[in-house]
C-alpha cells in the first residue's frame, strides 16, 4: 500500500512555518548588528533591493522546484535531471552545518527560558551569569541535547502534525514577543558615565539613517556581501528548507 506523503494542510501553515524559518536568531541578533556596522539605512536599502530582486527570484525558484518535483531536498534536483543530484547534497549540507551552532544557541535559549520561568529572570540578570553557564562542563550540553531532542520529535511527527502544528502555536507568541521587545527598546533610555542620555529612538535613527562616512568601493562591496549573506539567512533560500 502506497504511503501518504506528509504535507501542509493549508497555506496558512506553510506561511507560518516559512516565517518561523526566517524570523530566527539570524534576524533578531545578526541583522541589527550588521545594520549598525554597515551604515544603518545604507545597509537597509541595499538589503531591500537584494530581497526584491535576487532574493525573490531564489525564493520563488525554491518553492517552484518543490511544487514541481514533490520531493525532499535531496531528491528534488535529481528528479529534474540526474546531473543536478549533487545540488541536493549541497542544500542538505548547509542546514547540517548551521545546526551545529543553532543547537548550541537553542540550548542557551532553553536555559534562559527555564531560569525566567523559575526565578523571574533575577538570576539570569546577575553579572557573569552567561559566562559561568557556557563555561560549565555539563549544563550547556544538557540543554543542547534537550533542544535537539525536542526538535527531532517535532520533525518526526511530520509536516502537518509536527512542523505546521507547532508553527501555529509558536509563531503568534513569537510575534507578540518581538512587538514587546520593539516597544521596550524604543522606550529605553540609558545614562552613561559622562552624563549623556541615550534613548531607543536615537538608536532607531542610527538604524534607519544612511551613513556614508568612509564609504569606498571596497567598503561598498563588504556591505553588499554582508547584505547578501543576511538575505540567505532571512529567506532560508538554497538551504533545502523552502
Residue map of PLM features:
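Inter-helical loop and helix-membrane interface segments of multi-pass membrane transporters/permeases
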Residues: 2-6, 34-38, 71-90, 103-162, ...
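Selective recognition of specific alpha-helical transmembrane segments in multi-pass small-molecule
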Residues: 49, 53, 57, 169-190, ...
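Alpha-helical transmembrane segments and their helix-start/interface "positive-inside/aromatic belt" motifs
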Residues: 40-47, 82-100, 164-175
Amino acid at each position: 500500500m502506497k504511503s501518504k506523503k506528509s504535507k501542509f494542510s493549508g497555506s496558512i501553515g506553510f506561511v507560518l512555518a516559512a516565517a518561523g524559518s526566517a524570523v530566527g536568531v539570524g534576524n533578531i541578533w545578526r541583522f541589527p548588528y550588521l545594520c549598525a556596522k554597515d551604515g544603518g539605512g545604507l545597509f537597509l536599502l541595499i538589503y531591500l533591493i537584494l530581497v526584491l530582486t535576487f532574493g525573490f527570484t531564489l525564493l520563488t525558484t525554491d518553492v517552484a522546484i518543490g511544487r514541481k518535483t514533490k520531493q525532499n531536498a535531496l531528491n528534488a534536483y535529481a528528479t529534474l535531471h540526474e546531473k543536478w543530484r549533487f545540488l541536493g547534497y549541497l542544500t542538505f549540507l548547509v542546514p547540517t552545518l548551521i545546526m551545529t551552532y543553532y543547537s548550541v544557541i537553542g540550548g542557551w535559549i532553553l536555559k534562559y527560558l527555564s531560569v525566567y520561568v523559575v526565578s523571574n529572570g533575577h538570576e539570569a540578570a546577575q553579572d557573569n551569569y552567561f559566562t559561568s553557564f557556557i563555561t560549565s562542563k555539563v549544563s550547556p550540553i544538557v540543554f543542547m541535547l534537550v533542544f535537539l531532542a525536542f526538535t527531532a520529535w517535532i520533525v518526526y511527527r511530520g509536516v502537518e502534525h509536527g512542523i505546521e502544528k507547532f508553527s501555529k502555536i509558536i509563531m503568534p507568541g513569537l510575534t507578540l514577543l518581538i512587538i514587546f521587545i520593539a516597544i521596550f527598546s524604543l522606550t529605553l533610555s540609558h545614562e552613561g558615565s559622562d552624563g549623556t542620555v541615550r534613548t531607543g529612538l536615537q538608536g532607531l535613527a542610527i538604524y534607519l539613517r544612511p551613513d556614508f562616512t568612509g564609504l569606498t568601493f571596497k567598503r561598498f562591496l563588504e556591505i553588499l556581501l554582508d547584505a547578501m549573506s543576511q538575505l540567505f539567512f532571512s529567506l532560508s533560500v538554497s538551504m533545502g528548507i523552502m
